């Protein structure tokens, strides 16, 4: 089995790469995916988003090592094991990131990945329904929409932000990210619009793309060049030969794992695992970053939340309505309002993100209280804490060792304490007077720094945005794994393109920038001149130097 290009992983970036490499019909492409079909309502119905993330059938099901700053809890670290990868099991939220994120990438050595460079790729990939004119793409593969925003709690949240003195934004993926506004979703005609639906399935219809269901064991390297991928399929070990290049797009956990199993990584660690060193790249597995969040929950004194729909019977009614019409509550992820805020004066960009939900539920999907309620998922998104991914053994079937080192930087604690107090201020605004009941979580008695810290240690969870473990940078940077054209330094014919190459975590959910990475990487692989740089200047808050709002 062979093709011009072999891609490991059918996720956000891998699907986009397959689509672009196969576009003109010149090249053959094989996409290797360990997971199975994405068919069925658990994945395709937006409101069912909590299900695939908790199902072993669709998810690698990783756990972190005990996190010392979080009461030694092992934190859930899901990654998609299904066609479409994590874009098939995520929360369907679409955020490009802030302009400063990508300018920071370039400062860290990713030349050609500044905001002016990547904005044209965001436009190329988007089919935006209702975004800011001139800033959004309108004919790309990825449909992006807003929800119906029919619940009054969404409007109360946005009004509360304005009453607290914060900015409003008509399109946070346009010129102005900062402020309260409506959240965008990767949903089209009532269905999840994953990378599989947007990119991979259309590419498979061309006849020069083949999807292979198999488990990648290692990249085969001969004389310093990647020549194929060793996989397990139907109980046998096989080789998939790459006539031109191998592209690894296997996630921020599995991309470094596969490189290390192939002999690319920190030499001392590889030797400890009994793996022959092909390229000593100490940055493989290092620089792990993520977003954390907690749920701030409040009782609603009016019966307007989604609490009535939580019993199994009514969930079944919503599911049946979606199956028949692709409409109703099932056609939205229910994240329809949001905010992007700065925690302090002097910041160039927002660093706190809110997802607002018109129901109070726990991580397992059960009601947080026996009453109507609402909640905000609150996260500080520019943490300085760093972790790593290493091998557990040389056995490809062993899970990687994931150490996030969450909350290991003192600033993280300061910022998250601020998040708790800021959310109380927002929920305390006049707009919520008709809805606000008792505080469920953290609880009205949680006030001091010590009490808030104890709450955070017990309740902080991952927002499932890992990145950075195969960092992109200058070829002379010893910690860089790939150069700005996504080529693995020290090995010919091998690239990595997914969220693992991000030099720094972006501000927001990672599906959007991961797809953009695949789009831009495809041009590099094909040797195309990058799209012309944009000269559009994003909005800058004129009060940023003196105010946090």
UniProtKB/Swiss-Prot annotation:
Its cofactor is FAD. It catalyses: choline + A = betaine aldehyde + AH2; betaine aldehyde + NAD(+) + H2O = glycine betaine + NADH + 2 H(+). Keywords: FAD, Flavoprotein, NAD, Oxidoreductase. One of its GO terms (molecular function) is choline dehydrogenase activity. Its EC number is 1.1.99.1, 1.2.1.8. Pathway: Amine and polyamine biosynthesis; betaine biosynthesis via choline pathway; betaine aldehyde from choline (cytochrome c reductase route): step 1/1. Residues 528-549 are annotated as: Disordered. GO terms for biological process: glycine betaine biosynthetic process from choline. PROSITE patterns: GMC_OXRED_1, GMC_OXRED_2. It holds the Pfam family GMC_oxred_N. The active site is at residue 465. FAD binds at residues 4-33. The keyword NAD applies. Involved in the biosynthesis of the osmoprotectant glycine betaine. Catalyzes the oxidation of choline to betaine aldehyde and betaine aldehyde to glycine betaine at the same rate. NCBIfam families: betA, PRK02106.1. Belongs to the GMC oxidoreductase family. This is Oxygen-dependent choline dehydrogenase. The gene is betA.
